Amino acid sequence: MIRCENLSIGYHHAGKNIAVQKDLHLEVQAGELIALIGPNGSGKSTLLRSICGLQAPLSGNVFFRDVALNTLSLAEQSRLFSVVLTQDVQIEYSKVHQIVSLGRSPYTDRFGRLERKDRQIIDESLERVGMLSFAQKYISDLSDGEKQRVMIAKALAQDTPVILLDEPASHLDLPNRIILDRLLESLARDMGKAVLYSTHELELALQSSGKIWLMKPGGGGLLQGSPKELLEQGEIQKTFCNEYFSIDKDGKVHIR
């Protein structure tokens, strides 16, 4: 479904290209749940933004079903990728239903008028994340976990085959992290979505994701494999473990 070829990602500074990672070759298939992990500064957010077109790669190409992403209009891209970013929801005076309805923007007219089908998709998306009964509540009245589910409902309402999430659990307590984890599993398994998310929640990622993308620090590349494969190879331990904690071959974190 998604293919990245010779992808180099990074940023521009003082007229120069500063590469964070180079020559990445990656694929994402429908129904896959992929956790993108790595130390701070290894390029996780930059990679997500480069894949979905929010940030141009330094070189290389991203393809969706063999069509280069840079040949598509923004409207076409918005029907392929929905993105949930890290920052808090700051739309204080909007109701949940209004926020989720923004996901229908790629399909509505220039006035944003919702048809019957749009309203049905919005309600189905809210129901999918367990937030339909909150539709008329103000977003400012919700907990962090509830806000995050609203943003995922917005991504679902966008009706794209691919959902990308940047640190979706960053503001959540443990119970809400587990709820989110199960929801992402369901989107991939039951709806056939390709779900790629970055996270620092190592234990949850290793226990629930079918595939891991491990970004090595200092531009050291990206390793791919199942959690079991990368744990048995010791790659995750080499990347993350220090004198304060260790990770065993079952993906359990042990504090020393």
Where are these regions (language model features)?
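The feature captures the beta-strand-to-loop junction immediately N-terminal to the Walker
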Residues: 37-39
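Helix-to-loop junction immediately C-terminal to a conserved catalytic motif
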Residues: 52
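Conserved ABC transporter NBD signature motif
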Residues: 60-68
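Conserved ABC ATPase signature
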Residues: 138-142
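Catalytic Walker B motif of ABC-type/P-loop ATPase nucleotide-binding domains
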Residues: 163-167
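H-loop/switch region of ABC-family ATPase nucleotide-binding domains
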Residues: 199-200
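ABC ATPase nucleotide-binding domains
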Residues: 238-256
